[in-house]
From Swiss-Prot:
GO terms for biological process: positive regulation of transcription by RNA polymerase II; protein ubiquitination. Residues 499-510 have a biased composition (Low complexity). Gene3D superfamilies: YVTN repeat-like/Quinoprotein amine dehydrogenase. Keywords: Nucleus, Phosphoprotein, Repeat, Ubl conjugation pathway, WD repeat. It comes from Mus musculus (Mouse). Residues 288-340, 355-391, 408-485, 498-645, 658-691 are annotated as: Disordered. Signal peptide: none annotated. The keyword Repeat applies. GO terms for molecular function: transcription coactivator activity. This is DDB1- and CUL4-associated factor 6. Pathway: Protein modification; protein ubiquitination.
Length: 876
């Protein structure tokens, strides 16, 4: 090897290291910086230690062992050299493990891990399983994405999650916390989902946080504190020293899937979902002088992307080394049998969304959306695409396409309640978190379908025009989202006016995985249960109270406008779904998704137009009483009727009855209070009536958005650095999973996993592509280099951990193959941006619906014909 000149003295240097004559780090830096060394990498070992996708891997400080976590909810400590498992730990997690770390300086005996249900476990491998199960933190609302330990600190660790908070825990203070709605350990409230964190190695008080608004925020932890320590700042801008965002993503919502500091702390590597990898210097400030986009430019960039194609859930044909772009498959005649059907469905959805977009444009600025045409049922209902407030950074656009109720009815009518089959279990349990792009664990990947009791009535048009209690018809709501772990999502809901399943009591917030976006928490459009037991509450009881669906619809909308709250999904007992004069109700938006009334809220918040609505509603008390009797979900009414609600609820309750100045003052006081609102998925409120949960969630969301808007305004006045992009690394594809890691390897290389099943390695300084390794049958998610030796560990959707080392005798980098893979990835990344993943139940429902519509038309034609014959007979 020395004779070839590629790595002179390598054997002698390795010999010196084994004899302890040279520092291992010197050998690592000397040879790891050479591209010929990188291009000799070869698969050395495969560790089959899990029964599910391996979502996190971590070397211990000495590089002897690997800690891994998986969909099988187990933690495993293995020896990659002997290929043996040291310890298998039943973690106590009930959902997919996303991140696990050894606590430093604990002799690898203490582990911290987090999972998709938001629970963090503090595990001591020397303690029994029952004791370890007691050491859990349930503080996060929604998914917890990552755990980060502090160098040389065995007692503290940080976490980030979907609720937009970064939390700091000290095991000397407590080793568990199951307090409901706990805010004691919040270090930073980002107002947007915090999906990744990183600590600067040489200066560990610098903390980088990646958020769902495409931003990377760097904080000085010395300026921060928690409520537990008594010095919580309560502002998302406190301690912020830099904020990075690529210019072309400033008005988009690409989630950060990975953050990584360089060893010297001088650069940060950030990987974006549905985009590329960027390198920036946190001390740079040259982007400050760039022009800030106007509100009109933001509005234009947030427009709905085209919907070109559908993908069935579980279809992983676009991942792995053998994946091909659609154009190439068409050219080679390799179309799958279901392509024709999927394409026809895609064309149909495209037409719906185009029509919805047109109506959304015409409805923008109106009080609420109105139905198209004068038919007895709305064909398409939409939400406007953007708010006008320039200070509120909006993650995404959304629209609800509500198909006629007939689309969900079976081909034969029935007067008996029919239980619609749920397409996913996401509503019932957080176990099925879809952040991991694993075929086995993707029950909620991009589309949610919730089943409810659907009372299928006869096809009498008079009944449809005049709905009454107990005769509500289900509505198919297609919620198109441009934010999530995929680039686009459709949410499918089967809802009924007067009934819902018991599962809705736990899951009014659900995870939507979008292949190519962030994972988003989406409350189903109409799954809130009525006050009390949703199964035993009879429709007749509600009808006796004299509240008509039409009145409820109008009151709900007026209330949403009056109180300036973000719109919340109406209770399944509200009558809006069956009111032919109204479109389907707007759902409480996921992060960044704004419904019609929510957009009005954003547009009017700066001027407090809600006070004007309040002063023009003298009939409010009577409406309140009627709606409360019907157990609907007006936030203001329920907060005023429930004195046991949290302080924010108490603060907002009397505002509707006060004069405008008092209302403004109260809102301002509440907004500046210490009760810091966080991003709360509706499913978090597991106790108490459904209407109470929704009321609290709406108020929390309202104040969270207010605080976020104010903090974004403050950013322009603060001395916060705004770095420019230093280098961009392309060629890989990051669109199907939320845990795609990018990492530094030594001082000269950058690497990342990819949806094509390869490991990509670039030159750090030139972005030249240097190496391509086939490492998974579907997706490579995790890459962790050995702390000293030139060894790399990788994992992904395959149920194993792969160990790579420079064993090839000569360079094996195939430039031609790499160029082909890069070209395909670029094409498929663009395809993924316009692809929506739907469950099989969605396709079956659509086919049944179209068949039912066709049958209805034929029946209608026959009825018209018989009617004409009868008229002729009467004339005779």
């Amino acid at each position: 090897m020395a004779r070839s000149g590629s790595c002179p003295h390598l054997l002698w240097d390795v010999r010196k290291r084994s004899l302890g004559l040279e520092d291992p780090s010197r050998l690592r830096s000397r040879y790891l910086g050479r591209r010929e060394f990188i291009q000799r990498l070869k698969l050395e070992a495969t560790l089959n230690v899990h029964d599910g996708c391996v979502n996190t891997i971590c070397w211990n400080d000495t590089g002897e062992y690997i800690l891994s976590g998986s969909d099988d909810t187990k933690l495993v400590i293995s020896n990659p050299y002997s290929r043996k498992v040291l310890t298998t730990i039943r973690s106590g997690h009930r959902a997919n493990i996303f991140s696990a770390k050894f606590l430093p300086c604990t002799d690898d005996k203490q582990i911290v891990s987090c999972s998709g249900d938001g629970v963090i476990f503090y595990t001591n491998i020397e303690q029994d399983a029952e004791t370890n199960r007691q050491c859990q933190f349930t503080c996060h609302y929604g998914t917890t994405y990552e755990i980060m330990t502090v160098p040389n600190d065995p007692y503290t660790f940080l976490s980030c999650g979907e609720d937009g908070t970064v939390r700091w825990f000290d095991t000397r203070i407590k080793t568990s916390c199951t307090k409901e709605d706990c805010k004691d350990d919040i270090l930073i409230n980002c107002r947007r989902a915090a999906t990744s964190v990183a600590i600067c190695p040489p200066v560990p008080y610098y903390l980088a946080v990646g958020c769902s608004d495409s931003s990377v925020r760097i904080y000085d932890r010395r300026m921060l504190g928690t409520r537990a320590t008594g010095n919580y700042a309560g502002r998302g801008t406190t301690g912020m020293v830099a904020r990075f965002i690529p210019s072309h993503l400033s008005n988009k919502s690409c989630r950060v899937t990975s953050l990584c500091y360089s060893e010297d702390g001088q650069e940060i590597l950030v990987s974006y979902s549905s985009d590329y990898i960027y390198l920036f210097d946190p001390k740079d400030d040259t982007a400050r002088e760039l022009k800030t986009p106007s509100a009109e430019e933001r509005r234009e960039e947030l427009r709905q992307p085209p919907v070109k194609r559908l993908r069935l859930r579980g279809d992983w044909s676009d991942t792995g080394p053998r994946a091909r772009p659609e154009s190439e498959r068409e050219r080679d005649g390799e179309q799958s049998p279901n392509v024709s059907l999927m394409q026809r469905m895609s064309d149909m959805l495209s037409r719906w969304f185009e029509e919805a977009s047109e109506v959304a444009q015409s409805n923008r600025g109106r009080g609420r959306p109105r139905p198209r045409g004068g038919t007895n049922q709305p064909d398409v209902s939409t939400l406007p695409t953007v708010p006008s407030s320039p200070n509120l950074e909006v993650c995404e656009t959304a629209m609800d396409v509500d198909m006629p109720a007939a689309l969900l009815q079976p081909s034969t009518s029935s007067t008996d309640p029919v239980q619609a089959q749920a397409a996913t279990a996401a509503i019932e349990s957080p176990r099925s978190s879809s952040l991991l792009s694993c075929p086995d664990s993707e029950p909620r990947q991009s589309v949610e379908a919730s089943g409810h009791h659907a009372h299928h009535q006869s096809d009498n048009s008079n009944e449809r025009l005049s709905p009454k209690p107990g005769t509500g018809e289900p509505v198919l709501s297609l919620h198109y989202s441009t934010e999530g772990t995929t680039t686009s999502t459709i949410k499918l809901n089967f809802t009924d006016e007067w009934s819902s399943t018991a599962s809705s009591s736990r899951g009014n917030g659900s995870h939507c995985k979008s292949e190519g976006q962030e994972e988003c928490l989406v409350p189903p459009s109409s799954v809130q249960p009525p006050e009390g037991d949703s199964e035993t509450r009879a429709p007749e009881e509600l009808s006796e109270k004299g509240t008509l669906p039409e009145n409820l619809t109008q009151n709900q909308i007026d209330t949403a406008q009056l109180d300036n709250f973000p719109a919340e999904p109406l209770d399944s007992n509200s009558g809006e779904k069956n009111n032919p004069s109204q479109d389907s109700p707007c759902g409480l938006p996921e992060e960044g998704t704004l419904s019609e009334t929510d957009r009005e809220t954003c547009e009017q918040a700066s001027t407090e137009s809600a006070t004007r609505h309040a002063s023009t509603k003298p009939e409010l008390p009577s409406q309140t009483e009627a709606i409360e009797q019907a157990s609907t979900e007006s936030a203001t009414r329920h907060t005023s009727a429930n004195p046991e609600l949290p302080s924010q609820t108490e603060a907002i309750a009397p505002l509707a009855h006060e004069d405008p100045s008092a209302r403004d003052s109260a809102l301002q006081d509440t907004d500046d209070s210490d009760d810091d609102p966080v991003l709360i998925p509706g499913a978090r409120y597991r106790t108490g009536p459904g209407d109470r949960r929704s009321a609290v969630a709406r108020i929390q969301e309202f104040f969270r958005r207010r605080k976020e808007r104010k903090e974004m305004e403050e950013l322009d006045t603060l001395n916060i650095r705004r770095p420019l992009v230093k280098m961009v690394y392309k060629g890989h594809r990051n669109s199907r999973t939320m845990i795609k890691e990018a990492n530094f390897w030594g001082a000269n290389f950058v690497m990342s996993g990819s949806d094509c099943g390869h490991i990509f390695i670039w030159d750090r300084h030139t972005a030249e592509h240097l190496m391509l390794l086939e490492a998974d049958n579907h997706v490579v998610n995790c890459l962790q280099p050995h702390p000293f030796d030139p060894i790399l560990a990788s994992s992904g959707i395959d149920y194993d951990i792969k160990i790579w080392s420079p064993l090839e005798e000569s360079r094996i980098f195939n430039r031609k193959l790499a160029d082909e893979v890069i070209t395909r990835n670029e094409l498929m990344l663009e395809e993924t941006r316009n692809t929506i993943t739907v469950p099989a139940s969605f396709m079956l429902r659509m086919l049944a619906s179209l068949n039912h519509i066709r049958a209805d038309r034929l029946e209608g034609d026959r009825s018209e014909g018989s009617g004409q014959e009868n008229e002729n007979e009467d004339e005779e």
